[in-house]
Amino acid sequence: MKRLRNNIFATAAVAVACILGTTSAKAQEFTVQGDLVSSYVWRGVYQTGASFQPTLGFSIGDFSVTAWGSTDFDGNKSSEGLASKEIDLTAAYALGESGPTLSVASLWWAGQGAGKYFNFKSHETAHFFEAGLVYTLPCEKLPLSMAWYLMFAGADKNEDGKQNYSSYCELNYPFSVKSVDLNATVGFVPYKTLSLIHI
């Protein structure tokens, strides 16, 4: 397992080096952010109470990688068990300014002391691997964005141990009221799967 982990990190390092070496003329941007939230709701499903959610991101041209996390403040004193922990890693590529954005993500929220993070075996892993497609209409008066996310591998299994391919769709419309930026969002599950709670 240690050898597999080293191979994954080595491959990622080579890929990043190649990207940096071949696109040095493109703008590079680092993002460091931390949010405090009173409650954590993901895709309409309550996850935890007050949480700290750090973000670390890097983008170069149309390519970006993001590490995002979430942890509540209950720790071992939580009435529902051990503290909630989540780590999401995402790689995304935008196909031009008016094209769609494609993404691949590893979502892990097994929690404190549950599920080994570096276990990627199909029927043992606590990771959910998800592909995403986001498209924003190239219309200034109607900047509606549409997103489809599909869990294609990992812990999203049915009772028979087969992949569920759980999906989540979202429509988002940004607008302003008296210089205050707002978003109207509608999210839905296009079909029922046994692991609906994971969506």
Identify the residue ranges that each predicted region occupies.
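Cleavable N-terminal export/targeting peptides
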Residues: 1-29
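Outer-membrane beta-barrel initiation region
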Residues: 28-56
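Outer-envelope beta-barrel architecture signal
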Residues: 28-32, 50-52, 61-63, 87, ...
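Transmembrane beta-strands of outer-membrane beta-barrel pores
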Residues: 36-40, 60-62, 69-75, 95-97, ...
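Short sequence motifs at beta-strands and strand-loop junctions characteristic
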Residues: 46-48, 81-85, 123-127, 161-165
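Glycine- and aromatic-enriched membrane insertion/assembly motifs of diderm outer-membrane
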Residues: 48-106
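Outer-membrane beta-barrel architecture
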Residues: 55-57, 90-92, 132-136, 168-174
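Conserved small/polar residues in nucleotide/adenosyl-binding loops
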Residues: 197-199
